[in-house]
Amino acid sequence: MPNNNEEVLNIIFKISDNLEYEVDEDSIVTILEKQDHKIQKFFRKIKFRIPEYKKITLDEYSSYVFLQIDGKKTVKAIGENLEAKYGDKVNPLYERLLLFLNHIDVNCHYIEKTNS
């Protein structure tokens, strides 16, 4: 667990290896979550129409942040890029950015930390 703000801003994330996603022409990311629970497979076999993937479309800001995550950029660098592109619309910047990154790391497992 990082001890201070500087350590938090130096965290580097990468997209999880097993995550599937699509990017459209407007740079909007759609996460594809495979639905392969045994109950879902069973109902598909008896011809229920259950999609194999759940599609989650991110908004403009989330998509921009997600596409910045490359295993090299720090949280601080991603924040600076976000502020350069969107200006005051993203303030309070790091509070919102860290909340989003924590959510897609801890709750969704879309990304993972590459450094401690």
Predicted regions: what they are:
Residues 2-15, 47-116:
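Long, charge-rich, low-complexity alpha-helical segments
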Residues 1-38:
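Hydrophobic packing positions characteristic
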Residues 31, 35-55:
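Alpha-helical membrane-targeting segments
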